[in-house]
Swiss-Prot record, chain A:
It comes from the Bacteria. One of its GO terms (cellular component) is cytosol. GTP binds at residues 227-232, 246-252, 271-274. GO terms for molecular function: GTP binding; GTPase activity; metal ion binding. It comes from Thermus thermophilus (strain ATCC 27634 / DSM 579 / HB8). Homodimer. Heterotetramer of two MnmE and two MnmG subunits. One of its GO terms (biological process) is tRNA wobble uridine modification. SUPFAM superfamilies: P-loop containing nucleoside triphosphate hydrolases. NCBIfam families: mnmE_trmE_thdF, small_GTP. It is found in: Cytoplasm. This is tRNA modification GTPase MnmE. The gene is mnmE. Belongs to the TRAFAC class TrmE-Era-EngA-EngB-Septin-like GTPase superfamily. TrmE GTPase family. Its cofactor is K(+). Residues 217-362 form the TrmE-type G domain.
Swiss-Prot record, chain B:
This is tRNA uridine 5-carboxymethylaminomethyl modification enzyme MnmG. It holds the Pfam family GIDA_C_1st. It comes from Thermus thermophilus (strain ATCC 27634 / DSM 579 / HB8). Belongs to the MnmG family. It is found in: Cytoplasm. GO terms for cellular component: cytosol. Its cofactor is FAD. GO terms for biological process: tRNA methylation; tRNA wobble uridine modification. Keywords: Cytoplasm, FAD, Flavoprotein, NAD, tRNA processing. Homodimer. Heterotetramer of two MnmE and two MnmG subunits. Its main location: cytoplasm. FAD binds at G10, G11, G12, H13, A14, G15. The keyword tRNA processing applies. NAD(+) binds at residues 267-281.
Length: 432, 597
């Protein structure tokens, strides 16, 4: 636990809302905010002031969302520390990305009740409120324990432990070399082992992404030419008239969103305006917007009318795009096995489409691996240190790997220093 | 007879430093030992330092201790280990002349008015729950305000040669037969620990021509900056076990008291006997052995790596199976020793008994192993014993302050199930707590506590002012389009090369130049460790009052309450290091502490 380091959390309730709020508090909050912000420098803002701009990923320069940034300066903030609030669009995908860049820049996802706890520590709260925090900790501590237990059962637990095990053995090897430099400990193939451990961390994180979708919902975009049948498909998926369906191409000018649940995955389906070459400035804005939405979506359905000649494909993120051929009840104008034929009218192919969506979002394992935020954070931190360790001399490599191991130890409860000492003597014949 | 302020029991490396440090505070100190001629003796290998341990010695030196001075004066061979592996793990090891070391240690001790008394302490003199001094076996009473027990392996010591045993503290020396009872009567928990030592071979029976030579480094290294006159005098050597050695061991394991189950004591993992190595690493065909000269005249060599508790007859055969030792004559056989040690979790971080005020302990008695670990504790215990006698509060070295801090925190905070050895991997902040900056870290404390004169601090401060000034100069300097600091950060560049091209107005000493180089090259990692240290300090600032009723703290899990009640941490930082205590428990504890305040 740390009492001052920068922490961040999504402050708005889970699910889709008009706006979403991410809070960042602690020492260095303003500096972190400045790194992920394109707009007026938050470090120059007075307390209580706001600025308009964009949240960006400083690694790629990619803009994540337009947002309002509010600055509160210590002690005049909720926590009594420097605090920055980002107000973005309410999409869970956006909020998640904002959290990701904040964590990548050095903030830590807050523990349960941690904002409140800091407020109390800094004298922003009275005793009665503190009692409430305590009750929360008690209740949620129990819940967290049960969750952690459940999460650590079975396959995941074995994988994390195997990972930790390799890391500890590697660390023990380095330490055996450093603490017993003369005793003939075999030289280390550190780079190969680190790369192998890294690959496994990546694999777990990829699954984590799938399981976070399962927990927090995903954003699904329907993209296609005007009148390709996107709105009808959305209606068929939803089972009621949601989008405005009309035979006039380009009816959906902007976009429509609808909540949807498939196999327990909360989805936000976005039915975009059609994508076609157009002179109409209003419609063209809609097209650009549609492509932008596709970029942000977790999964894209590229919807094409099979009864009409096949149009030239728009620029889409194809790696996470499913191709759908609509109006399969009509005589086909073309055949393409990459496209999934469906009919919104008869319901043909809808079940297969749902299954394909589920698989694309959760992977073939069906998202059995559920990773909590804590586990994801631990893996992210471990990954960062492992990548760094690759290029370091032995003593610093040892320190970096030790931090990686500590991150994983948060999940397994192992005592890193003790484990390493134990393994030095178990695995190596050293000591005189 | 007048009373003492501090009585130190034992003249080993812990007792020496305890008496030396206590005397620095101007109190009246007596050191009681069975054999005053053997003060400062090295019962195991004739070397000081090595990874983890050299950092302890550097801190002892910075705190005004005597071990570094004695080792440098008696040095016959030095090596810097891990030279290429980074500043955090570079370690000096000094081979010493065994007799000269003891002599130098005794000479240094004589610089302060410590009364050395011959005798065996039989018991603590306790009346009405108050410590009044000690009683000796021959019936003397020595009144004292504070007592430091530094009995090494002597407390109810038993030595083993094969399956035969006899009471002894070390080879040829009687054990402390009664003191254990006294500690038990106070309420301390005693455990049996075990350690071992290899055979000593007559030097003139060894064929050195068949051994691999390890020459001493020139110029020699030192702990104090003043290498002794013989510090680059002698080589050390290496040999290896053979198939015949391994067969002899395997065929005769039943003769070992450990494998036969006679010894119950817990031995250290890091000091395995040759039997252990052969059994546990059966696929290794050969083990490296280090042949260390005992001194300048080298009448005896020490066979490092060959400790054993097999019977003497067999040891002869085993030794003769080694290349270069075909006609070797064993002068002293290897043996194992079992002894009492107390549970260090019953001590304060000033190494004072929680059960009897004024009683301090240090060294193997507290469950450690090694001269350096003993010396470090002796210094802290002696200092606090003197402060106790003067009515001053205990002083501590927190974990983030360095190796001694980690040593004490591990011992007192978690306890140990085997003799504890210092290792670099135990120290989270090892990049900040290097041997080379021990002076910067600890001289201010040493001066504040009266262990070193004020002038020393002025000298150290001047040194680091020059280092800081040079770093500022390099920051402003432009070299090949970048600042001097950035240029220095490139792995292929050195400070020496930079200073040649852009010399400072006054050249830096080699030590100062090294500081500049390390600080420039490792700036990013040092900064990260500094943040970690701040975090440790934050939690340290949350003090937990003595006698806190943990089960009554709302929100604490039962498991955590139990563990906290057992370990009795003094701060949130200490609580955080207890296995099984979670962040949510710390939060609950912090809220509770805040509420009480």
């Amino acid at each position: 636990m740390n009492l001052k380091d920068p922490i961040c959390a999504i402050a708005t309730p889970p699910g889709k809302g008009a706006i979403g709020v991410v809070r960042l508090s602690g020492e260095g909050a303003l500096e972190i905010a400045a790194r992920v912000w394109r707009g007026k420098d938050p470090r120059r803002l007075k307390g209580g002031r706001f600025a308009l701009g964009e949240v960006v990923d400083p690694k790629t320069g990619e803009a994540i969302d337009q947002a309002i940034l509010l600055v509160f300066r210590a002690p005049r903030s909720y926590t009594g520390e420097d605090l920055v609030e980002f107000q973005t669009h309410g999409s869970p995908a956006v909020l998640r990305r904002v959290m990701e860049v904040l964590v990548a820049e050095g903030a830590r996802p807050a523990g349960r009740g941690e904002f409140t706890f800091r407020a109390y520590l800094n004298g922003k709260m009275d005793l009665a409120q503190a009692e409430a925090v305590l009750a929360l900790i008690e209740a949620e501590g129990e819940l967290a324990r049960r969750q952690a237990l459940r999460a650590l059962e079975g396959a995941l637990s074995r994988r994390i432990e195997a990972l930790e095990n390799r890391l500890l053995n590697l660390l023990a090897h380095i330490q055996a070399l450093l603490d017993y430099p003369e005793e003939g400990v075999e030289p280390l193939e550190a780079e190969r082992t680190i790369r192998e451990v890294l690959a496994e961390v990546e694999a777990l994180l990829a699954q984590a992404k799938a399981s976070r979708l399962a927990q927090k919902g995903a954003r699904l975009a329907l993209i296609g030419a005007p009148n390709a049948g996107k709105s009808s498909l959305l209606n068929a998926l939803l089972g009621y008239e949601r989008a405005l369906v009309s035979p006039i191409p380009g009816t959906t000018r902007d976009y429509l969103e609808a909540p949807l649940e498939l196999f327990g995955i909360p989805l936000v389906a976005v039915d975009t305006a059609g994508v076609r070459e157009t002179e109409d400035p209003v419609e063209r804005m809609g097209v650009e917007r549609a492509l932008g939405i596709a970029e942000e979506a977790d999964l894209v359905l590229y919807v094409v009318d099979r009864s009409q000649p096949k149009p030239a494909p728009p620029p889409l993120p194809w790696a996470r795009t499913l191709k759908v051929a609509t109006k399969s009840d009509l005589p086909p104008a073309w055949e393409d096995p990459e496209f999934l034929p469906v009919s919104s009218l008869t319901g043909e192919g809808l079940d297969r489409l749902k299954e394909a969506v589920r698989e694309a979002l959760l992977g073939r394992e069906g998202g059995e691996v559920l990773l909590t935020e804590r586990q994801v954070e631990a893996l992210l931190r471990a990954r960062e240190r492992l990548e760094e360790a690759l290029s370091l001399p032995e003593d610093l490599m040892g320190l970096a790997l030790e931090e990686a191991a500590r991150a994983l130890a948060l999940l397994t409860g192992k005592e890193v220093a003790e484990e390493v000492v134990a393994r030095v003597f178990q695995n190596f014949c050293v000591g005189k | 007879m007048a009373g003492y302020d501090v009585v130190v029991v034992g003249g080993g490396h812990a007792g020496l430093e305890a008496a030396w440090a206590a005397a620095a505070l101007g109190v009246r100190v007596a050191l009681v030992t069975v054999n005053p001629d053997r003060i400062g003796m090295m019962p195991c290998n004739p070397a000081v330092g090595g990874p983890g341990k050299s950092q302890l010695v550097a801190e002892v030196v910075a705190l005004g201790g005597l071990m570094g001075r004695a080792a440098d004066a008696a040095a016959i061979h030095t090596r810097v280990l891990n030279r290429s592996k980074g500043p955090a793990v570079q370690s000096l090891r000094v081979q010493v002349d065994r007799d000269l070391y003891a002599l130098k240690a005794q000479e240094i001790l004589a610089e302060r008015p410590v009364e050395v008394l011959r005798g065996e302490v039989a018991a603590l003199w306790v009346e009405g729950g108050r410590l009044l001094g000690v009683r000796t076996v021959d019936g003397r009473t020595l009144p004292a305000k504070a007592v430091v027990v530094a009995g090494g392996t002597f407390l109810s010591g038993v030595v083993w040669y094969g399956r035969k045993s006899r009471p002894a503290g070390r080879q040829g020396e009687p054990p402390a037969r009664f003191l254990s009872q006294s500690l038990k009567a106070v309420g301390h928990t005693l455990r049996r620990f075990k350690t071992g030592t290899p055979p000593r071979i007559r030097a003139d029976s060894v064929d050195f021509g068949r051994l691999e030579v390890v020459p001493p480094e020139v110029p020699p290294g030192s702990f104090t900056g003043n290498p002794g006159p013989h510090a680059a005098r002698l080589p050390t050597w290496q040999t290896r076990t053979t198939a015949r050695t391994h067969r002899l061991i395997r065929e005769n394991l039943h003769l070992s008291p450990l494998y036969a189950g006679d010894i119950q004591g817990i031995g250290p993992r890091y000091c395995p006997s040759i039997e252990d190595k052969v059994v546990r690493f059966a696929d290794k065909e050969s083990h490296l052995l280090f042949v260390e000269p005992d001194g300048l005249s080298t009448t005896e060599v020490y066979l490092q790596g060959f400790s054993s508790s097999l019977p003497p007859e067999l040891q002869e055969e085993m030794v003769r199976s080694l290349p270069g030792f075909e006609r070797a004559v064993i002068q002293r056989y290897a043996y194992a020793v079992e002894y009492d040690s107390l549970d260090p979790t019953e001590l304060t971080r000033g190494l004072q008994s929680r059960l009897l005020p004024g009683l301090f302990s240090a060294g193997q008695v507290n469950g450690t192993s090694g001269y350096e670990e003993a010396a470090a504790q002796g210094l802290l215990a002696g200092l606090n014993a003197a402060r106790f006698a003067l009515g001053l509060p205990e002083v501590h070295l927190p974990r983030e302050s360095g190796y001694i801090g980690v040593l004490v925190d591990d011992l007192v905070g978690r306890g140990t199930d085997e003799p504890y050895r210092m290792m670099t991997s135990r120290v989270e902040l090892r990049l900040l707590c290097r041997a080379d900056n021990a002076d910067e870290r600890l001289t201010p404390l040493a001066v504040a506590w009266g262990l070193r004169p004020k002038e020393d601090l002025e000298r150290v401060e001047a040194k680091y002012r020059r280092v800081a000034a040079e770093l500022r100069r390099l920051q402003a300097l432009r070299v090949e389009g970048v600042s001097g600091l950035q240029w220095l950060r490139r792995p292929e560049n050195t400070y020496r090369a930079l200073a040649e091209r852009f010399p400072p107005s006054e050249p830096l000493s080699p030590e100062e130049a090294y500081q500049v180089e390390v600080r420039a090259k490792y700036a990013g990692y040092i900064e990260r460790q500094e943040r970690l240290r701040e975090k440790m300090k934050d939690l340290e600032a949350f003090r937990i009052p003595e006698g806190m009723d943990f089960p009554k703290v709302p929100g604490l899990s039962r498991e955590a309450a139990e563990k906290l009640s057992r370990h009795r941490p003094k701060s949130l930082a200490e609580a955080a290091r207890i296995p099984g205590v979670r962040d949510s428990d710390l939060t609950a504890l912090a809220v509770h502490l805040r509420r009480g305040a």
